């Protein structure tokens, strides 16, 4: 894969990313990362030999919140990187239309074989 031209060093989320819509709070990726935070709280209890599910509920809630917050920005960065890649790809396709010819659209009748019921 070709590296981006003029990448901004040490920038997690450039100002250009503000134009993208924010990820929804019910995004499955965010919920999964929040669940990983809950699991890390359980593992912390297990390592410290506390009751796994009941000890330190406030700590588990803190892990969930911290992981969800970090995951929000990771998902936002991922969406930004995909948007940059798509913009570059579509720009290339616009500049080189001879490499991407339009294909004729086929109907379902042309794709599927004739149906002959066997009795």
Swiss-Prot record:
Keywords: Electron transport, Membrane, Mitochondrion, Mitochondrion inner membrane, Respiratory chain, Transmembrane, Transmembrane helix, Transport. The keyword tRNA processing does not apply. The chain crosses the membrane at residues 56-75. One of its GO terms (cellular component) is respiratory chain complex I. Its main location: mitochondrion. GO terms for biological process: mitochondrial electron transport, NADH to ubiquinone. It is found in: Mitochondrion inner membrane. Signal peptide: none annotated. It is a single-pass membrane protein. The keyword Thylakoid does not apply. Complex I is composed of 45 different subunits. Interacts with TMEM242. Belongs to the complex I NDUFC2 subunit family. Accessory subunit of the mitochondrial membrane respiratory chain NADH dehydrogenase (Complex I), that is believed not to be involved in catalysis but required for the complex assembly. Complex I functions in the transfer of electrons from NADH to the respiratory chain. The immediate electron acceptor for the enzyme is believed to be ubiquinone. PANTHER family: NADH DEHYDROGENASE [UBIQUINONE] 1 SUBUNIT C2-RELATED (PTHR13099:SF0), NADH-UBIQUINONE OXIDOREDUCTASE SUBUNIT B14.5B (PTHR13099). This is NADH dehydrogenase [ubiquinone] 1 subunit C2. It comes from Pan troglodytes (Chimpanzee). The gene is NDUFC2.
